[in-house]
Amino acid sequence: FLGVLNIINGSAGMFVNIPSLIIVFGGTLMVTMMRSSMSDFVGAVGVAGRSFGNPLEKPEALIEKFVEYAELVRKDGMIALESKVSEEKNEYLKRGLEMLVDGKDKGYVSTQLTKDTEIMVIRHERGADIWSAIGDFGPAMGMIGTLVGLVQMLANMSDPKSIGPAMAVALLTTLYGAFLANVIAFPIQQKLKQRMVDETLNNELILTALNFMQDGGNPRVL
């Protein structure tokens, strides 16, 4: 962002104002922490990081994997999946494979994995809610900073040197608030919502395929 501003007018430094940053980002953080618990806030940051850093498998890739697993099961039984458990990076699928290897029945597997999906949905919904709150509080803090800057400016009209810094606080807090909301918070919120939908669909696909293998289904059907 600052790089773009630097290209436009050759000086990104004029868009950096420490008091404005403290008002917007510090104020937003404080209000968000008052609204929710520390664990929820940390969880929201963590789930956002995982959403950007750990891409989900494509459904097509999962289907190909299950065709291989189903063929293995038809040849050598469920115990043959034990060699695949340690290789599996998808924690949800890995947990399912472990239960199949342990001989858990279909109802047990479905219940446990459905609970895992429900927990994942709650985690993502909480994260999205907190990022939505940050998006709401950011512009509000920007408006507060603008009012603070205007009050400082009007209170020192007799001193021309103080008008510039006060006006900078007034304008830049509005800019920072809009930036925090529309460039950071709301995009992350939407990312979490989409991630939740995609991960839920993947989990449903995995559960269906695991149950299919438990029923002794033909790999060609997959």
Report each predicted region and the residues it spans.
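Large intracellular
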Residues: 4-127, 199-222
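Helix-termination/interfacial motifs at the ends of transmembrane alpha-helices
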Residues: 1-12, 116-195
